[in-house]
A protein has these predicted regions:
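Active-site-adjacent loops and short helices of periplasmic peptidoglycan-processing enzymes
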Residues: 1-144, 154
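Domain-terminus/edge residues, biased toward the C-terminal soluble/receptor-binding domains
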Residues: 121, 134-309
């Protein structure tokens, strides 16, 4: 795990941050980064329409059940990818963005090299493990590398517009009615300042989370990988979430040491506890609730350059 000051990249806390393991659906953060670059360059727009193919619709795992007879905008698919963690949506945007999924994965790895993610290799746009290949043939990264990616996303894309949304309907015009999506990030709306970024889980990856929170103009990034419950059991991410809460508070405590006393006191004010952490990694649909976007369009922000923590 690693805790980083988002503004400077300074490491505030770490524990085996260079251990290599699968990121699971956190892979979709790099997919978002590459699509954001395409939109910023003018190669795509958020309104670009994507005709779904049979290949898109055959993705397993978490999905929005795309059908080859359907068409959706890039924007709709990005919401599905970031909120529902939809593998079929990730596959569709990757295919359209680069002409093929294989070409898109090459762009993902090029972006990783650009950001200095030296222990990262991507092989999919969604993070699903290979069904019949060795573990080494799947997506691999480290908490330190993913902190670099998170900083890039925060400073150079509008990722928070998507990652901060707790609930949203997908496919409003579908004949069968919309799918009610609920964000898998259980800290949203419960822990002060949390507005992203992405969870992940597979049997080999364990429970993963790239989280970020902002308080009084200061922001921390927390990356946790390979979390399991007691005795290595599945716990729907409860252990991961409780650890993330602890690390977020630890990060703000470290940042507060450099602030004036009044701001330090405010930053360290107690936040609402989570007596029972409800998890939605495999949960079913929930009612739609509206959410106001934080930004409009993929625009670059003025921020410090991305540096390796």
């Amino acid at each position: 795990m690693i805790v980083v000051d988002a503004a400077t990249g300074r490491v505030l806390s770490e524990d085996n941050p260079d251990d290599v393991s699968p990121p699971a659906s956190m892979t979709k953060l790099m997919t978002f980064a590459v699509v954001a670059d395409k939109i910023s360059s003018g190669a795509l727009t958020r309104e670009t329409l994507v005709k779904i193919t049979n290949e898109d619709s055959k993705m397993g795992g978490t999905q929005v059940y795309l059908d080859a007879r359907e068409t959706f905008s890039i924007d709709e698919l990005l919401y599905a990818m970031m909120i529902q963690s939809a593998n079929d949506a990730a596959h569709a945007v990757a295919r359209v963005s680069a002409g093929s999924v294989e070409a898109f994965v090459e762009l993902m790895n090029a972006k990783a090299r650009e950001l200095g993610m030296t222990h990262t290799t991507f092989r999919t746009p969604h993070g699903l493990p290979p069904s019949s290949r060795l573990k080494a043939d799947g997506d691999l990264t480290t908490p330190r590398d993913y902190a670099l990616l998170c900083r890039y996303l925060l400073f150079h894309t509008n990722v928070l517009q998507y990652s901060s949304v707790q609930r949203r309907d997908f496919g409003l015009n579908r004949k069968q009615g919309p799918q009610h999506m609920r964000n898998h990030n259980n800290l949203l709306g419960k822990i002060a300042g949390v507005d992203g970024l992405k969870t992940g889980y597979t049997a080999s990856a364990g429970y993963c989370l790239s989280a970020t929170a902002e308080r009084h103009g200061r922001r921390v990034i927390v990356v946790i990988m390979g979390s399991f419950g007691p005795n290595g059991q599945r716990d729907l991410g409860k252990t991961r979430d409780l650890k993330a809460i602890e690390l977020i508070e630890r990060g703000f405590t470290a940042l507060a040491s450099s602030l004036p006393n009044n701001l330090a006191t405010a930053m360290n004010a107690p936040t609402a506890a989570i007596p029972t952490v409800k998890t939605f990694e495999s949960a079913g649909p929930t009612p739609e609730q509206s959410s106001t976007p934080r930004a409009d369009g993929f625009t670059f922000r003025v921020a410090p350059p991305v540096k390796k923590p």
